[in-house]
């Protein structure tokens, strides 16, 4: 994997980070939150109320990756 993501998709507090490793794509999903010290942090755990945005991010990530792969052929 490169040090920089190929693309990021953000919906609300949910982020899909897309990585390109020699043409093979992977996706990390995370939720942003503020801790007790009011600092922004990320977690891979999601609440029930996050799941719709997780699904939307996953869908948009799949579309973005599919378009990238289609331009190679």
Model-derived regions, located:
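Single-stranded nucleic acid-binding surfaces, predominantly the OB-fold ssDNA-binding core
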Residues: 1-73
């Amino acid at each position: 994997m490169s040090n920089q993501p190929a693309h990021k998709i953000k919906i609300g507090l949910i982020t899909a980070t897309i990585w390109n490793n020699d043409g093979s794509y992977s996706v990390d999903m995370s939720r942003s939150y503020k801790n007790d010290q009011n600092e922004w942090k990320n977690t891979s755990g999601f609440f029930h109320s996050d799941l719709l945005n997780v699904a939307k991010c996953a869908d948009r990530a799949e579309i973005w990756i599919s378009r990238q792969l289609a331009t190679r052929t």
